[in-house]
Each structure stands twice: as C-alpha cells, then as structure tokens.
Regions:
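Structured beta-strand/loop patches that form or line metal/cofactor-binding pockets in enzymes
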Residues: 28-74, 80-81
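Cysteine/selenocysteine-centered motifs that mediate thiol-based redox chemistry or coordinate metal-sulfur cofactors
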Residues: 3, 32-34, 102-147
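Solvent-exposed, charged interface segments at domain starts and junctions
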Residues: 1-8, 72-82, 130-136
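Residue-level preference for alpha-helix termini and adjacent loops
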Residues: 13, 37, 45-47, 59-66, ...
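A hydrophobic, small-residue-rich beta->alpha segment in the mid-to-C-terminal subdomain
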Residues: 75-116
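Surface-exposed loop/turn and secondary-structure junction residues enriched for glycine/proline
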Residues: 39-41, 49-51, 63-70, 86, ...
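Charge-rich, low-complexity N-terminal segments
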Residues: 1-33
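Non-catalytic, beta-rich accessory domains that mediate macromolecular interactions or localization
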Residues: 12, 62, 77-78, 86-89, ...
Length: 147
C-alpha cells in the first residue's frame, strides 16, 4: 500500500483519485478561506512517456500523453498535481489536496483515508484486469517444444 504522507506516493494517489473526491476535499480545505495563490494554471499539455526497453534496459520514448498539471501555494505550503488527460478541475483540486496534506491540515486524516481507499480500489481493478487477460498469455517455450 502506498503512503499518502510520502510526496511521491501522494502524487500517484492523487492522479488515480476521481475528480469529485478531489474537488470535495479541496472545497473543504478552502472553507476557512486560507491564502491561496495559483502558481501554475491547470492547462492540458503533452508529456513524453518514457519506458525502459526490457532487453538492454535503455530508455525508450513510448509516445506523448495528455496530462493536466497544476501548482498552488496554500497558506505558505506548495502543492502540485498532474492528472492524466484533460481535467483542469481535478488538477487544481489535486494540487490543493497535496498542499493540505503537506501542511497537515485538519482534513488530512480524511484525505489520507480516501486516498488509501482509492489506491486499494485501483489495485483491485488491476488484479481483476490481469486475471481476465491472464488466460491469453502465450508461452513460447511450450510452443517450441510441441513442434
């Protein structure tokens, strides 16, 4: 399980969280009207997705993907989020959530619990998807032995 208090893990958890949950927490954090400045407007952009080639372990540019980044400063604490696809609301909300957790806002325990639940749901979804496609795996060594 990923730790929402670790910033790298939190970035992944926020990116996987649904827009409504992020927006709800962002609105709750902003209820007290803390000082907020937007350091990077949420705007969709292209990002080169790089993977590691499995044979020689060299970096390989897989292609460009659309992401929406945003950065805020909330009461002196910076927050950042990068959401897959075009979703300005989720990116801005995610940046606010990141800043709130980093600053240990009153809503942090509820936010952390929700991020952990989203992580568990995503892991379960990946397991189901893998289980559904697993039977289509081809074992080339077995095929060679049969010839």
């Amino acid at each position: 399980m990923s730790d929402p208090h670790d910033r790298s893990n939190r970035f992944e958890l926020i990116a996987a969280c649904d827009e409504e949950t992020l927006a709800g927490f962002a609105n709750e954090v902003l209820e007290d009207d803390p000082p907020l400045s937007i350091r990077q407007d949420p705007r969709p952009q292209l990002l080169m997705q790089q993977v590691q080639e499995p044979v020689e372990r060299r970096p390989f540019n897989l292609g460009e993907v659309v992401v929406t980044p945003a950065e805020v400063e909330l009461g002196g604490t910076r927050g950042f989020a990068m959401i897959p696809g075009k979703n300005e609301r989720a990116a801005l909300s995610g940046a606010i959530v990141d800043a709130a957790v980093a600053a240990n806002h009153d809503r942090t325990p509820a936010i952390v619990e929700s991020l952990r639940a989203a992580d568990a749901q995503q892991r379960a979804k990946r397991r189901r998807s893998w289980a559904e496609s697993r039977h289509t795996t081809v074992d080339f060594q077995t095929m060679e032995e049969q010839q």
